[in-house]
Amino acid sequence: MTDTLNPLVAAQEKVRIACEKLGCDPAVYELLKEPQRVIEISIPVKMDDGTVKVFKGWRSAHSSAVGPSKGGVRFHPNVNMDEVKALSLWMTFKGGALGLPYGGGKGGICVDPAELSERELEQLSRGWVRGLYKYLGDRIDIPAPDVNTNGQIMSWFVDEYVKLNGERMDIGTFTGKPVAFGGSEGRNEATGFGVAVVVRESAKRFGIKMEDAKIAVQGFGNVGTFTVKNIERQGGKVCAIAEWDRNEGNYALYNENGIDFKELLAYKEANKTLIGFPGAERITDEEFWTKEYDIIVPAALENVITGERAKTINAKLVCEAANGPTTPEGDKVLTERGINLTPDILTNSGGVLVSYYEWVQNQYGYYWTEAEVEEKQEADMMKAIKGVFAVADEYNVTLREAVYMYAIKSIDVAMKLRGWY
């Protein structure tokens, strides 16, 4: 395995190993190694200067074994079909670990949204829905926000879908909507809240006291921000935060006594950057990755913990809040060095869990308070965490292997009952 392994091949290998360790019928791997449906579309957009550009878009529906497909849509210049297929596979197992009635889905458009005007972005978003309309629906495939997409884009998605659907207000076809338009309280904070719960429980499992732990978080976007906030709420102390600046590149902040979340957030809102924050010293990105911590939480980019970087990480536990932050080679090195790891499929699953709550609330037209959402989320995540930990102990496997195995158990039963093998 190398750091450049195709993401789909890497995901398939994890599924193969999990099926093998469980002693599954060979048909289980055959049914799960490839998506059931992948659609590629071309989306023409009339630009503000009068020219027409055509953008490539995709939607992958990995499995319908237990229910409709569910997963985000990303707008990014590096999106491609293999990435979308791999991410849809991961979503099947993320939902399976949580016991959700979903298979995995993922979509994308190859575009840098920063280069588009708001009008162009809206036309592109609506074009994606038009191209995929007959494959979407609250009982077919349910998209949500992902990289560079948000509640506004989900609102355009819904509006276009309703126009195509004979004005039926099937707003549950998309989640991650603003609260004013059928969204759920707690959705914006859901992933970071869930990460903090997983960090807390993983710390207990590996004998780390949260109140004494030195914790580092890479990234202060949506996931990183709410991870830091909720780790602090759980009694933890974040002493290092790494971030990126358009002008100055990668950098980090460090305070061994802990960085105050409220002060940091107020500084960022006032200055649009963390650079110059008086409550911590600025350090380099390289220093961030080599300092001594109890727990490190990559919450930004994929493939940041490479084989080389894994050799210098000085922590007892890695909790993957980002999607795919550890390369296969990095994973191998961490395991060899005895550094424990809680995988992304479990750690960052809070987002899809609260998306599920949004979908449920849309069906009933009855909406919960933020406190009710948090209570339900913690209970459901605790069930998944305990289940994954139990599988790891029963089979003497890593937590990454265990989360796939735990998910496969329920998916396997559904496929067998449906007569798929």
Swiss-Prot record:
Catalytic activity: L-glutamate + NAD(+) + H2O = 2-oxoglutarate + NH4(+) + NADH + H(+)
SUPFAM superfamilies recorded: Aminoacid dehydrogenase-like, N-terminal domain, NAD(P)-binding Rossmann-fold domains
Binding residue positions for substrate: 70, 94, 355
Keywords linked to the UniProt accession: NAD, Oxidoreductase
Binding site for NAD(+): 191, 222
Entry's EC annotation: 1.4.1.2
Effect upon mutating residue 243 to K: Severely crippled in its ability to bind to NADH. Decrease of binding affinity for NADH and increase for NADPH
Known pathway: Amino-acid degradation; L-glutamate degradation via hydroxyglutarate pathway; crotonoyl-CoA from L-glutamate: step 1/5
PROSITE patterns in the cross-refs: GLFV_DEHYDROGENASE
Active site: 106
GO terms for MF: glutamate dehydrogenase (NAD+) activity
Important for catalysis, annotated site positions: 146
GO biological process: amino acid metabolic process; glutamate catabolic process via 2-hydroxyglutarate
Important for nucleotide recognition (site feature) positions: 243
Record annotation: effect of changing residue 243 to R: Decrease of binding affinity for NADH and increase for NADPH
Record-linked SMART domains: ELFV_dehydrog
Class of enzymatic activity (EC top level): oxidoreductase
Pfam family, one: ELFV_dehydrog
Record family assignment: Belongs to the Glu/Leu/Phe/Val dehydrogenases family.
Protein name: NAD-specific glutamate dehydrogenase
